Regions:
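His/Glu-rich zincin catalytic helix
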Residues: 1-85, 193-299, 409, 419-427
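Charge-rich, well-structured scaffold segments of protease-associated domains
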Residues: 1-2, 85-234, 277, 286, ...
Length: 427
């Protein structure tokens, strides 16, 4: 039996202790006991997402896999060798289970009020064993093609991914997370097995538990568990080769009002340890400029040029970062011009002030502490694999951030960044 020792990290703002360790096989484990809840949420995060289609082989050659393969694997891993499915196994224990794939990660979750260790066994089985057959892959291709068509029929999804494709042409971000019709049809037994072997190893995964459980119980579970030897070498990531953006584009769909997206691509790198802080800085900047507390939003809203649909998306990783504003508007051309100009001249924006920053900070504080009442939110937002700050550092980060910090982040993104727009017009 191997002794498992957890390090404690106390977060004073939320009065919580997170227990962390790295097992002998490379798996990172983080625990947050919260006795005031009845449930437990468990989440395994695999550092493998839709952008991870380019890999460097041992001989130095770069191999490209079909777009959508991470999402395809997420679907297939629920299938057991006897053709039963692990989702049903979770249900038989009274647990809910789910999974989702993002640009950089795949997450597998369960929630339950009982049978914690049995659910942990199922979660372990889910991410450490793969059972593929040619027939089951063909069936899954049909299912995912239908899922892809559903997304293509959704105007908001179409707007987001079309804008992203024009921000990052020729990169994995140019294709939807589920893949394209062609790429889905190219996924086969061999490339699924190769990607499972490469990415689904303990050193590339983390487990997070939050809710009503005893740390000692989980500690004992891992001390008694037979851990298989595993490759503990980190998985190399390919950097994107950025091409020129497509500055403006449009299409027609069955929508009642035009939909506009403004995308800003950062062309400078962000260090991995700084990604979470940089994400917060950009959210603060664009909330001041375009959020509901800004004079710009209020004037546009009162004049009927925009409505409450205006939303902000911020993505920051060490390989790419972008900001996207989406909205319904009767005047997409005029608003695109106005927003582009405001972004380029952000240092002169009258909405960017110390007082306004304090208002946005207080709003973010409120949202954060409210979200701490949701185990699901915590389980999906906390990443035990983060090399820098995590969601529990948010209060400390907000207290430390100055207006100068926000402006510096704006310069980092905008000064030599690219801006595109995409419009969906009514057909």
């Amino acid at each position: 039996m191997i002794k498992v020792v957890f390090e404690e990290k106390y977060y004073p703002a939320v009065k919580e202790i997170v227990y962390r360790t790295r097992l002998s096989n490379g798996l990172t484990v983080a625990l947050l006991p919260k006795k005031e809840f009845k449930e437990v949420y468990g989440s395994v995060t695999v550092q493998f997402g839709s952008v991870d289609t380019l890999v460097t082989e041992v001989d130095g050659d770069v191999k490209e896999y079909p777009a959508g393969i991470a999402h395809f694997l997420e679907h297939k891993l629920f299938e057991r060798e006897d053709s039963s499915d692990l989702m049903s196994a979770f249900t038989s224990l009274g647990a809910d289970s789910n999974a989702f794939t993002s640009f950089t990660k795949t997450n597998y979750l369960f929630s339950s009020t009982d049978y914690l260790l049995e659910n942990l066994d199922l979660l372990d089985e889910l991410v450490t064993s793969a059972h593929f057959t040619e027939d089951s892959i063909l069936r899954e291709q049909d299912i995912i093609q239908q899922e892809r068509e559903m997304y293509q029929d959704d105007p908001d999804s179409c707007l987001f991914f079309s804008t992203l494709a024009n921000l990052y042409p020729g990169t994995p971000l140019a294709t939807d997370i589920v893949g394209s019709e062609e790429s889905i049809s190219q996924i086969n037994l061999t490339n699924l097995q190769e990607n499972f072997t490469r990415f689904y190893k303990p050193v590339n995964m983390s487990l997070f538990l939050v809710g009503n459980f005893d740390v000692e119980q989980v500690q004992d579970y891992f001390e008694r568990k037979e851990l298989k030897d595993s490759d503990v070498q980190d998985v190399a990531r390919e950097k994107f080769v950025l091409q020129d953006v497509k500055q403006t584009d449009s299409m027609r769909m069955e929508v009642s009002s035009p939909k506009l997206a403004i995308g800003i691509r950062g062309n400078r790198e962000v260090a991995e340890v700084d990604c979470y802080r940089h994400h917060i800085l950009l959210k603060l900047l664009f909330a001041m400029m375009f959020g509901w507390t800004s004079d710009r939003f209020q004037k546009l809203y009162e004049s009927g040029k925009i409505d409450a649909s205006l939303s902000l998306e911020v993505e920051v990783t060490s390989r790419f970062h972008f900001v996207m504003l989406t909205m319904d508007t009767k005047e997409p051309v005029a608003l695109s011009h106005q927003f582009r100009k405001a972004i380029r001249n952000f240092t002169k924006d009258l909405d960017i002030t110390e007082d306004h920053l304090d208002i946005i900070k207080r709003e973010m504080f409120g949202e954060f502490f409210s979200s701490m009442n949701s185990l699901e939110f915590i389980a999906t937002q906390y990443d035990a694999f983060e090399h820098g700050e995590t969601i529990f550092d948010l209060p400390k980060i907000l207290q430390e951030i100055t207006l100068e910090d926000v402006l510096d982040a704006g310069h980092h993104l905008i000064d030599d960044g690219d801006i595109v727009d995409f419009t969906i017009f009514p057909s």
